[in-house]
Amino acid sequence: MWPERGVNPLDQARQLLRHLADARVQYDSIMLDIEGSNWINGSYTAIQNQDFVMALVNAFTEAGVPVAIYCSWQFNQTFGSNFTSLSRLPLIYAHYDNIPSYVDIADSPFGGWPSPSGKQFFDGAGGEQICGSGALDWDWSREPWW
């Protein structure tokens, strides 16, 4: 889920869950894609961003839906360097270094995660695709996190 920062987080969570139920979609978890200028454009403080993302996480958790977090090193800029409330959730981070390993995060951990659950290591900028799918990002993990 790409949360729209200017829209009520509870409404977004409820709407997504309603659409998934209406479409009878089976899923194991919801991944919150926390990145981009809508989080760090100066309109919101780190505390406001913390409250927003925790409202989303709590809404899904209360509905019995597991949550994972997708983000990058912008995390500290978005939430502040002392925010660790998400560290109990699986972390999938982006670092487009074309290396499928976690060696890069060991030197620059963030968010209180002891280790990530997955890494997006290639962004498909060359237009790589499968069966006309459009550009693909490539992810890696040591073991399934979902």
Annotate the PLM regions.
Residues L86-W146:
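Functionally critical loop-and-helix segments that line ligand-binding/catalytic clefts
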Residues M1, D28-I34, P66-C71, P90-A94, ...:
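Structural recognition of the beta-strand scaffold that forms the well-ordered cores
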Residues I47-Q50, Y70, P109-G112:
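Short, well-ordered coil↔helix boundary/capping segments
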Residues M1-P66:
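Substrate-binding cleft of extracellular glycoside hydrolase catalytic domains
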Residues T45-Q48, N82-S87:
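Short, surface-exposed, charged loop/turn segments at secondary-structure junctions
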Residues V7-D22, F75-G80, S101-S108:
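Alpha-helical scaffolding within the catalytic cores
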Residues W2-V7, E35-I40, V67, W73-Q77, ...:
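Solvent-exposed loop/turn segments at secondary-structure junctions
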Residues V53, A68-S85:
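Active-site-adjacent substructure of cysteine-protease-like catalytic cores
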